[in-house]
Each structure stands twice: as structure tokens, then as C-alpha cells.
């Protein structure tokens, strides 16, 4: 099960992860068209949170026990037990936003134009997510969580809680 993690000491808050996420999920795959001409506008499923000198790229963590899944009233969120991916079916979304409220990382976003949510899909079908492949400082890494200690104090989960003001 691969996940995206942030090496906080290398993130310079350039927001290119947001740009490449938007581009990857655009119909045209062209930067200018994705930002100016496509409708509905492609939205990035990642965002950069900044607090003082700390910056982190925040996205869906594809949790082992996804609170968004349990909160989803329309059955739009599911978990693939083989890959560990938390998936989303926009056709089933009823726009109740319960998943947004349930996510402890604030990683699920509201698409007000389409009246549904959007979240990181790890650029399904690609070898490496666009945010990771295009990070100029290699602050984002795509690693197998089975081979790494995610309970380490520098893990992305704890980093995200700290930047959001948690414990």
C-alpha cells in the first residue's frame, strides 16, 4: 500500500503540487486550458497548509479506518481492501458533506459547482502521483507504508495534526 508523505524540511510552499494535481485531473492535460478554459474547472485534490516556517502538502491519507466512509450517507465512499485506497464514486454523492466534516485531516474538498466532493485518488493508473513526480525539492515521496514506520513522530499524519493545531 503506497502513500504520499511529506518531508517537511524540504517543502518550500511552492504550491506546484496543487498545480500538477489540477493538471493531472484536467480533460486537456494542458496547463493554460486547465486553468482558464475547461468547464467544469479541474480542482486540485491537494492543498498546501502553511503555519509560520512550516508548510505541508495535505491530501487524503487513505486511512485504514476511514471516518469519511462511515459518515457517507450516499454510499459514495468505499475502501478497496486489496490496495487500501479510499475510493469515491461521484455518481453516488448526494452532496451532504458529511465526509468533509468527518475527515480529521481536512483532506476532502467541496466542489460547489458540481455539488459534490473531490479527494486525492493518488492519480490512479499512474505509476507515481503527479504531485510527487513534479515536486522540485523532492519534499513529497510515494512510499510503501508496509516498509516504513508511519508511527514515527515525523509521519505525515502527525505533521498534519500539528499544522492544523491538533496534538
Residue locations for each model-derived region?
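A short local structural element in Rossmann-fold oxidoreductases
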Residues: 22, 73, 104
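A generic structural signal for beta-strand entry/edge sites
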Residues: 3, 83-85, 117
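Conserved beta-strand segments that form the floor/walls of ligand-binding pockets within enzyme
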Residues: 5-6, 87, 102
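N-terminal beta-strand motif that seeds the catalytic metal site of vicinal oxygen chelate
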Residues: 1-9
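N-terminal signal-anchor transmembrane alpha helix
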Residues: 12, 18-25
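Flanking helices and flexible, charged tails adjoining ferredoxin-like Fe-S electron-transfer domains
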Residues: 27-70, 90-167
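Ordered, amphipathic secondary-structure segments that act as subunit-interaction surfaces
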Residues: 62-85
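Aromatic-flanked redox-active Cys/Sec active sites in thiol-based oxidoreductases
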Residues: 8, 74, 90
Amino acid at each position: 500500500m503506497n502513500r504520499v508523505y511529506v518531508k517537511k524540511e524540504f517543502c518550500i510552499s511552492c504550491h506546484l503540487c496543487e498545480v500538477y494535481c489540477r493538471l493531472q485531473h484536467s480533460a486537456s492535460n494542458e496547463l493554460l486550458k486547465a486553468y482558464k478554459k475547461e468547464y467544469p474547472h479541474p480542482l486540485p485534490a491537494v492543498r498546501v497548509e502553511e503555519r509560520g516556517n512550516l508548510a505541508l502538502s495535505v491530501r487524503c491519507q487513505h486511512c485504514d479506518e476511514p471516518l469519511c466512509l462511515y459518515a457517507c450517507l450516499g454510499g459514495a465512499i468505499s475502501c478497496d481492501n486489496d490496495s487500501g485506497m479510499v475510493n469515491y464514486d461521484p455518481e453516488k454523492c448526494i452532496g451532504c458533506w458529511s465526509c468533509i466534516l468527518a475527515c480529521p485531516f481536512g483532506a476532502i474538498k467541496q466542489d460547489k459547482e458540481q455539488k459534490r466532493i473531490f479527494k486525492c485518488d493518488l492519480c490512479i493508473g499512474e505509476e507515481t502521483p503527479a504531485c510527487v513526480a513534479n515536486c522540485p525539492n523532492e519534499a513529497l515521496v510515494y512510499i510503501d507504508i508496509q516498509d516504513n514506520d508511519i508511527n514515527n513522530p515525523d509521519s505525515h499524519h502527525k505533521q498534519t495534526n500539528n499544522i492544523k493545531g491538533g496534538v
